[in-house]
């Protein structure tokens, strides 16, 4: 007989109520094992264990067991001991242990049976000798075992000698049955406190009343019960209907040959009943029809207990006195494989038979009298049901109707937090919630990094993370600027310090030989003789005065040959001199990795590929040496999302195991860990810079698994967005996409053969290449302007250009005039904004290709590109710009007033995948301009308006409400309409323009949500030529990237020029030289692009209205004074951003610029009832500041900055609701009492239940609590 498991124990047992059940066994009373040992043990077994000979947990007990039962909630195991004790046990799955909870000795002698109530987990019944039956309350008896007294069921109708079987009614919690050594069974009612029914049976064969030793209740019918006789003369199973208790309803007496010892009625199918007895057999019955279904092979001794697994009824176990507990399945039936095996066995030789006969087990199958499928294998009617996407679909039993329901299942709730974060592009609530339920310390560090990124932006974060620990760059730069004259005087003093005087003469042949070479002008010989005589310093001075580069190189080589192996500084000098960092990356101590990263930044300012390669190589080395967080920072700087994913994927199993230890099931642990991974990856990819394709199969598999989990909650929109971010040529992605579309009630879009492409989905634009020159469609002239007043094709903004170069993919560009906005692949989506009333007059052959400087310190700035005619030969728009070549991006002066509709079915000039690597050097310009560097003050950036895109352009889905995109658009030309550019990431620290006093007031209810702009400019107030061509760019705030360039063209007369430009915010870029006409050349310097080409300065007409821009410092302190009622009918001049965007409406400054750097200036405006919160937090911060070690000064400074954000919100009354303010009052009160753990509970409550209000200040409160607790003593 094939067995699923076999445990070599002579023991009674009980099943757990799990889907994958465990089995607990206890040495049965009255037996001695093969070693004649009388030891007793309670053991826990797993059906999935690799070694079935060893239990997963064991506990020695001082007495043997008569019975065991496991509570329905799996918390308590009750044991009936032979010494008269009732003992309770608990299991601990974390460390696989069994522990004794309590022991009771209320029975006068041996306890024979125990049974937990089916309806109330805390109620237990026990029976023993002398007719003793006790009712136990687990809640009370475990609290005070020594003082607890169990209840009795009441008065019995007749005396009972021994109670050996108990069974609770499955429908009524107060009714149970008992049976024993007497010739009757009793039905008890605890409410009536007495025996209410007396069952007895007289055999028709012998005329003698039979002993009813076993009792079992019907699983669904409260009036039906089964009893079994223990007599060997007439073994029978009796089915009773208590409404007629005089005569059994059914009698099953054609199976067992001897007395019956055990019954079990299947709880999942009332048509199945198991029995076992002293004839060593187990029988399966249909008690409803009184049919014997199967007889299982006989065992070697009595089978005294058999039970179905409660939650896996296909399995059952049988305990016998043959020293075995066997676990079998109802499906153990004869099949064709058994017949083939029998034929093979008969063909083996006699030698093989006798060699193997002692090792082979019996594979006897059960005898089947009537084949009956359990109800859980199929429906009795032709109905069917299935589930997908959170919906359960059922065909009604009559087959004529359909029922669709949305069941609420624990663990399959919709991820509303992630969906909302993608919609609002505000990940702070998600981060705050994750920070209070981190899995381990490493996971907490990752979320702290994301929280820091969300507050500072990528550029500011990297600037701080890659700076030296003692590098106060801002203070040093200011001090250097103030003392610049003193520095020049210092070097002048050094230069003039030596004054030759007095007589001297040349001594020795060496000096004379070298001097002769010098005075003769033979510099090479002088250097040669100096080096041959080990006069290295003299050789260096001689070479410095020479213009011969080879000579200088030879002297440096001599220096490195002598000192390179002796001095660490020489190694640094060698790498800097050779402009190679391989030696530093491979050999410099990893603890000094910041020296290497600085060298990489400075030596490869323009070679992005080489710089990123070295940063990744350094990150790999840091990761190998245990510097995990530092390696993540370098991968972020290099834009290597794949490297970050590889680290997190390798840690996934460990995080899953840690969740399992928190008493979570395997599924719960896996789904929670998967959701956390996707959320962490999504948030991180929002800040990473670079363009990449998802090729990691393991990462794709995780996303598909999460998509499947998301669809299980019915959130098809979120699932569709993530599917759109995956490679479209992946077969599994295609299958899942089709499945989700059909389940959501949509169909796959028809692919137009004329416009189909083979491009892969990327973290940026995954569907179409917007940079390919477009050929006109035959039969449709490219210069024809077609009035378009209808809805745009495929959701595009009317009149938007389809040929804009994409900006850097992971960090949003400041502005762009292209209709498509690309960010990080998993960045939040772009939202549609209201179209501007301005209409651009432009020829259909023109293209707007304006680039905004990426706000990443390692990304190069971009240059606007010129137009290209669609009728010309297709050009590579990514090829390096040659001197004299026109710059793309200018507007044609001849244009129509109405934007043209894109031609239909135009043929692309080239396929996108052929153009993937054609952009090397497109940003390189030949002209070098060096000017005196100076430090510029940073200004604030407000997010511009948002564009609608037909497809998600980043790794993060484009819109939480989007569905499957239509087929790719044809590369047809279209006129450019003045639409708002895509938004900046609102946390990126990039410069913006200061709004004039006439800017309308923007009302923001949540400072952490993207501001909504509804500003409309009147038609005709601005010349479209000025809007498109006379745009200037603000220098990027990136300290390492070259600043953006300005495109210049002559404005049309009568046009309104843009507002004056603010100063460049690049601390390393030189100051732009002001020209007489008010324009300036772009700054250049050691950290800028050496190949930048500058244009003639623009000439603007004098603005008719509007004051000059206010400095950001004044704006921060006097923000209210520059706000204006938007209802006034004023005409607003256009506001320019750092990229050519003609109609960029003014936006409010970022939160960081609005928060006053002095908290004292805002305290007087805070409401009186909230002032104590501010006062205490200030005082507590002042208290801990001198007590905090110097190495934690950065954390203290960060805490101060975050608390000022909180004070700002309390002053403005714009973010925090009253419940959150009440929580802050409670938190402050607890901190005053030094109850920091309780204060952290309040913090967790805010992060969990008020995450939208937590923003960036909540981490500051948490940090202050931690510092205050650490400095308490």
Curated annotation (Swiss-Prot):
<feature type="modified residue" description="Phosphoserine">
    <location>
        <position position="349"/>
    </location>
</feature>
<dbReference type="Pfam" id="PF07304">
    <property type="entry name" value="SRA1"/>
</dbReference>
<dbReference type="Pfam" id="PF00400">
    <property type="entry name" value="WD40"/>
</dbReference>
<feature type="repeat" description="WD 6">
    <location>
        <begin position="255"/>
        <end position="295"/>
    </location>
</feature>
<dbReference type="InterPro" id="IPR024298">
    <property type="entry name" value="Sec16_Sec23-bd"/>
</dbReference>
<protein>
    <recommendedName>
        <fullName>Protein transport protein SEC31</fullName>
    </recommendedName>
</protein>
<dbReference type="GO" id="GO:0005198">
    <property type="term" value="F:structural molecule activity"/>
</dbReference>
<dbReference type="InterPro" id="IPR036322">
    <property type="entry name" value="WD40_repeat_dom_sf"/>
</dbReference>
<feature type="modified residue" description="Phosphoserine">
    <location>
        <position position="988"/>
    </location>
</feature>
<keyword id="KW-0813">Transport</keyword>
<feature type="repeat" description="WD 4">
    <location>
        <begin position="158"/>
        <end position="198"/>
    </location>
</feature>
<feature type="repeat" description="WD 2">
    <location>
        <begin position="60"/>
        <end position="99"/>
    </location>
</feature>
<dbReference type="GO" id="GO:0005783">
    <property type="term" value="C:endoplasmic reticulum"/>
</dbReference>
<keyword id="KW-0931">ER-Golgi transport</keyword>
<feature type="modified residue" description="Phosphoserine">
    <location>
        <position position="992"/>
    </location>
</feature>
<feature type="modified residue" description="Phosphoserine">
    <location>
        <position position="1053"/>
    </location>
</feature>
<feature type="region of interest" description="Disordered">
    <location>
        <begin position="933"/>
        <end position="1162"/>
    </location>
</feature>
<feature type="compositionally biased region" description="Polar residues">
    <location>
        <begin position="994"/>
        <end position="1039"/>
    </location>
</feature>
<feature type="modified residue" description="Phosphoserine">
    <location>
        <position position="980"/>
    </location>
</feature>
<dbReference type="Pfam" id="PF12931">
    <property type="entry name" value="TPR_Sec16"/>
</dbReference>
<feature type="modified residue" description="Phosphoserine">
    <location>
        <position position="999"/>
    </location>
</feature>
<dbReference type="GO" id="GO:0043332">
    <property type="term" value="C:mating projection tip"/>
</dbReference>
<dbReference type="GO" id="GO:0070863">
    <property type="term" value="P:positive regulation of protein exit from endoplasmic reticulum"/>
</dbReference>
<feature type="modified residue" description="Phosphothreonine">
    <location>
        <position position="1050"/>
    </location>
</feature>
<keyword id="KW-0472">Membrane</keyword>
<feature type="repeat" description="WD 3">
    <location>
        <begin position="106"/>
        <end position="146"/>
    </location>
</feature>
<keyword id="KW-0968">Cytoplasmic vesicle</keyword>
<dbReference type="Pfam" id="PF11549">
    <property type="entry name" value="Sec31"/>
</dbReference>
<feature type="compositionally biased region" description="Pro residues">
    <location>
        <begin position="1095"/>
        <end position="1110"/>
    </location>
</feature>
<keyword id="KW-0853">WD repeat</keyword>
<dbReference type="InterPro" id="IPR021614">
    <property type="entry name" value="Sec31"/>
</dbReference>
<comment type="subunit">
    <text>The COPII coat is composed of at least 5 proteins: the SEC23/24 complex, the SEC13/31 complex, and the protein SAR1. SEC13 and SEC31 make a 2:2 tetramer that forms the edge element of the COPII outer coat. The tetramer self-assembles in multiple copies to form the complete polyhedral cage. Interacts (via WD 8) with SEC13. Interacts with EMP24, ERV25, SEC16 and SHR3.</text>
</comment>
<dbReference type="GO" id="GO:0005789">
    <property type="term" value="C:endoplasmic reticulum membrane"/>
</dbReference>
<feature type="repeat" description="WD 7">
    <location>
        <begin position="298"/>
        <end position="338"/>
    </location>
</feature>
<dbReference type="GO" id="GO:0090110">
    <property type="term" value="P:COPII-coated vesicle cargo loading"/>
</dbReference>
<dbReference type="GO" id="GO:0015031">
    <property type="term" value="P:protein transport"/>
</dbReference>
<dbReference type="InterPro" id="IPR009917">
    <property type="entry name" value="SRA1/Sec31"/>
</dbReference>
<feature type="modified residue" description="Phosphoserine">
    <location>
        <position position="836"/>
    </location>
</feature>
<feature type="repeat" description="WD 8; interaction with SEC13">
    <location>
        <begin position="385"/>
        <end position="405"/>
    </location>
</feature>
<feature type="compositionally biased region" description="Polar residues">
    <location>
        <begin position="1118"/>
        <end position="1129"/>
    </location>
</feature>
<feature type="region of interest" description="Disordered">
    <location>
        <begin position="815"/>
        <end position="835"/>
    </location>
</feature>
<keyword id="KW-0256">Endoplasmic reticulum</keyword>
